[in-house]
A protein has these predicted regions:
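Extended alpha-helical targeting/anchoring segments
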Residues: 1-329
């Protein structure tokens, strides 16, 4: 998240003892495609493989970085900025942290069984681990076609709810509709900076995707890239994703950086790959666990618009983090 701010010329002064790397880049030496169960044959000692499956150790319970009273103060400040016309929507981030060391392979396997998502990933490095069940595609490029799928709208599942009832809720809810329309317009604008005029279009508008604990309100947008657009041009135009920031993007980022006292680290950043033919795929890092320096961090953010209610948005952050928190039980 922090390095994406720098790309837009936005300075971030805040730091904390839990600050993570600004960016990590890998060049893969081996790519393995798994289509069925696998067996490992190696000259390495068994203990070397066992190190990949060390048990999770939980040393302290999770704590929320800001309580509701503090959240409400930030919410009220942003509500005033919205009334003054400085921003139209803004996403407030909260974090859950505990002291722990995790087995990322086990966590990822369990997460995929219970809450599989299209942009999921797992990284196990000697210094840190990341486990994510992100549902959001920020950027998918194949040839000269580019696609983004912003998510704006979240509904907690109940025993009686289904996709049809969720879609009816979103379409009849003025707040959710406003929020979704603003984010879609911003993502269309971001795409237009790098696409041939007239080619940016909505492929599928306002549909529902279903997950274990919630429903999401999604729109798919595409465009045809202008000739000469570089990887840097595309990344700078599209990142960070508007659906997890708010709009307008630059001013909203500035307002967030004034009130959020800790780095977001990986949260609302992006993970993905770039091929040698310049095709690429990047997600938005949400629904994720960062384990670094024996601390696990789970972040969530919900949107504030003119008619938002602080308590509802605060509780929505918990709903979004719930499936990840359950992994530690």
């Amino acid at each position: 998240y922090e390095i994406l701010n720098y790309l837009l010329g936005i300075k971030i002064s805040k730091q904390s003892k839990n600050s993570f790397y600004k960016g990590v880049f890998y060049k893969p030496e081996t790519i393995i495609k798994i289509r069925d169960n696998i067996s490992i044959f190696s000259n390495k000692k068994k203990q070397e493989f066992n190190n990949y499956f060390k048990p999770t150790k939980i040393l302290s319970p999770f704590k929320l970085n800001i309580k509701y009273q503090k959240y409400k103060k930030i919410f009220d400040i942003f509500s005033k900025k919205i009334r003054q016309g400085e921003t139209y929507q803004i996403k407030i981030c909260t974090k859950y942290r505990n002291k722990s060391s995790i087995n990322p392979i086990n966590f990822f396997w369990r997460l995929m069984k219970s809450n599989a998502s299209p942009e999921s990933f797992m990284i196990r490095d000697k210094n840190y681990s990341i486990v994510s069940c992100s549902p959001e595609t920020l950027l998918l490029k194949k040839g000269n076609k580019i696609i983004t799928k912003p998510i704006a709208g979240t509904l907690r599942k109940s025993k009686k709810s289904n996709r049809s009832s969720a879609l009816k809720f979103f379409r009849n809810n003025i707040k959710e509709t406003k929020e979704h329309n603003m984010i879609v317009d911003m993502e269309r604008s971001d795409l237009s900076r790098v696409c041939i005029p007239g080619t940016v279009k909505i492929d599928k508008e306002k549909y529902v995707e279903e997950y274990r604990h919630l429903f999401h309100y999604v729109t798919t947008i595409s465009g045809s890239l202008l000739k000469g657009m570089t990887i840097k041009n595309i990344i700078k135009s599209m990142m960070p994703g508007g659906s997890v920031i708010g709009c307008p993007k630059v001013r909203t980022l500035e307002l967030l950086n004034q009130q959020e006292k800790e780095n977001r680290n990986i949260f609302t950043g992006s993970f993905g790959y770039i091929k040698f033919n310049k095709d690429m795929r990047f997600n938005i890092i949400i629904r994720s666990i960062l384990n670094y320096k024996n601390t696990s961090e789970i972040s969530a953010a919900s949107g504030v618009v003119l008619d938002s209610a602080a308590k509802k948005e605060f509780n929505e952050n918990f709903i979004k983090a719930k499936s990840l928190l359950e992994l530690f039980k």
